[in-house]
Amino acid sequence: MTLFPLPSTSDPAEADESTKRGEQARALCLRLLTARARTRAELEAALAKRGYPDDIAAAVLDRLTQVGLVDDEDFAEQWVRSRRLNAGKGKRALAAELRKKGVDNEVIDGALAGIDAGAERTRAEQLVRDKLRREKLGDPDDRDAENKVARRLVGMLARRGYNQTMAFDVVTAELANERERRKV
């Protein structure tokens, strides 16, 4: 059974070559998908990089989408869940990562819709708390040392895609809580 329609040509050697290239493209996509889930755009780029014609790439990707091996919506949801849990990424960073992987904006919005501001703030507080436990705070009257720690923590949250205003509020509150905890 052939997964790809044979091109209308009178030369059977050319038709065999097209079928062979289609099978090679399919094998490449399956090998890439074995390592991790990928977006359609990532697979298109991999096929283009290896010189597969657009019509063969489109046929292979359409078939993989049809059987459910390529699903950008599912990929985006899994990516958001994984990166929030393991890397502590905020909405902004997650959206940028998904855009870079070629996911459509509507799909990104749908994947990020499940994250509310309260959950994002809670995750930021947890990240700051974990980091503060390993920080040496020094003298509470030394404002320079306190500002240095605060800048470092706000920067950490900013790199993970958290809003700067929220990051500053979280860091200020968690610094005060940690100082209070260490007094006891």
From Swiss-Prot:
Subcellular location: Cytoplasm
Keyword line: Cytoplasm
Assigned GO CC terms: cytoplasm
Top-rank lineage group of the source organism: Bacteria
Region (Disordered): 1-21
KW Cytoplasm (keyword) present: yes
Biological process per Gene Ontology, one example term: regulation of DNA repair
HAMAP family from the UniProt entry: RecX (MF_01114)
Function recorded in the entry: Modulates RecA activity.
Family indicated by similarity: Belongs to the RecX family.
Protein name (Swiss-Prot/TrEMBL): Regulatory protein RecX
Organism expressing this protein natively: Mycolicibacterium vanbaalenii (strain DSM 7251 / JCM 13017 / BCRC 16820 / KCTC 9966 / NRRL B-24157 / PYR-1) (Mycobacterium vanbaalenii)
